[in-house]
Amino acid sequence: MSSSRFLILCIILISFFPLHECENGKSVESNKAMKPVCMPVNCNNKDKKLTCACCIGANPRNRCYNSRSQCTADCKL
């Protein structure tokens, strides 16, 4: 194999690495966006249903809400 063919092969192989990193970065970002910010909890001991939602994550506000939509709106801030 001549040196020019070897050089072209090396350039092609090296060019695949950024494409692989780009694909993995995309999947990491999409997973990060899909993480829930609220966790369903039981606010009433008499009721066995998960009726409330509380903030979770790296910086939780230790707040619980009657609905998941209220929790999501406040916890994302």
From Swiss-Prot:
<feature type="disulfide bond">
    <location>
        <begin position="38"/>
        <end position="54"/>
    </location>
</feature>
<protein>
    <recommendedName>
        <fullName>EMBRYO SURROUNDING FACTOR 1-like protein 9</fullName>
    </recommendedName>
</protein>
<feature type="signal peptide">
    <location>
        <begin position="1"/>
        <end position="22"/>
    </location>
</feature>
<keyword id="KW-0732">Signal</keyword>
<feature type="disulfide bond">
    <location>
        <begin position="52"/>
        <end position="71"/>
    </location>
</feature>
<keyword id="KW-1015">Disulfide bond</keyword>
<feature type="disulfide bond">
    <location>
        <begin position="43"/>
        <end position="75"/>
    </location>
</feature>
<comment type="similarity">
    <text>Belongs to the MEG family.</text>
</comment>
<feature type="disulfide bond">
    <location>
        <begin position="55"/>
        <end position="64"/>
    </location>
</feature>
